[in-house]
């Protein structure tokens, strides 16, 4: 298996417009950063698998079907009969930028536990990828960190996207501490220009990524929205400009970029 992703898959209720009475209309779209990355890489030919947990409900069944239809192995996807599939309400402004409201308290993805993640799946993986959303609460935090540590010992390349969502954390200080905790295990890191100062205390890509590289991270991407991406590989750094285009919705853009890079 080329890439195994661990974490959340959820429903993005995305506003699509308003009806004739001005009532907002929403579409139920599949989402969740690790799942998005698995799909993006699979579409480019990589063999991918997703490990996570959904509810025993219509949304959970739909998400499993969507991943399978996109050639993502879902054999490691658990179903929780007692907790619902996670949902996020996503509003998009005129520039295509997003605002998230999560309905996640006691949802299925948070209930991922160590026993849900098989040793066989980790042994088979060339790359094991995770994000910070599964680090916001236990038992998913402990399960994710345990799986990543096991995968590292088994020789997998560890990739990480902090994917900061302020309203999922108790406070900013807790978020920073938890997002930093797994960095010594990471081989390849993707952060946004919003997340770089949270992890390093600076907005400067050169000095910020140099700090991160000292933790043993071999390859670092800093996504810059319309301005493209900054990268560091050891002592070598560079910038790739963004391609001008009409933006409809930036949701999943970073996941798609990282999935393409890893594939």
Regions found by a protein language model. Name each.
Residues 1-73, 77, 246-248:
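Glycine-rich phosphate/adenosyl-contacting loop at the front of the ribokinase-like
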Residues 1-4, 149-153, 201-263:
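Conserved phosphate-binding/catalytic region of the ribokinase-like
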Residues 2, 47, 157, 188, ...:
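Proline-centered loop/turn at the N-terminus of a beta-strand
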Residues 39, 87-91, 228-231:
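Short beta-strand scaffold segments in enzyme catalytic cores
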Residues 47-130:
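Conserved N-terminal subdomain of the carbohydrate kinase-like
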Residues 133-210, 228-229:
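Conserved beta-alpha-beta core of the PfkB/ribokinase-like small-molecule kinase fold
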């Amino acid at each position: 298996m080329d890439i195994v992703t661990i974490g959340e898959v959820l429903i993005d209720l995305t506003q699509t417009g308003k009806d004739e009475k001005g009532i907002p209309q929403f579409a139920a779209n599949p989402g969740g950063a690790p799942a998005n990355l698995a799909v993006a890489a699979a579409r480019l030919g990589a063999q991918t698998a997703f490990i996570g947990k959904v509810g025993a409900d219509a949304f959970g069944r739909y998400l499993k079907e969507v991943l399978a239809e996109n050639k993502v192995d879902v054999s490691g996807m658990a179903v929780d009969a007692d907790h619902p599939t996670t949902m996020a309400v996503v509003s998009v402004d005129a520039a295509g930028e997003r605002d998230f409201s999560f309905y996640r308290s006691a949802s299925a993805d948070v209930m991922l536990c160590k026993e849900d993640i098989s040793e066989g799946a980790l042994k088979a993986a060339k790359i094991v990828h995770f994000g910070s959303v599964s680090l916001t609460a236990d038992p998913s935090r402990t399960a994710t960190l345990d799986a990543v540590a096991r995968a590292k010992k088994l020789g997998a390349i560890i990739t990480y996207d902090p994917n900061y969502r302020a309203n999922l954390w108790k406070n900013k200080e807790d978020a920073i501490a938890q997002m930093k905790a797994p960095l010594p295990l990471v081989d390849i890191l993707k952060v946004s220009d919003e997340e770089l100062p949270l992890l390093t205390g600076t907005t400067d890509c050169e000095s910020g990524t140099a700090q991160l590289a000292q933790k043993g991270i071999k390859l670092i991407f800093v996504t810059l929205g319309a301005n493209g991406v900054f990268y560091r590989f050891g002592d070598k750094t560079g910038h790739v400009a963004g391609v001008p285009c009409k933006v409809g919705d930036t949701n999943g853009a970073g996941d798609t970029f990282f999935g393409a890079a890893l594939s």
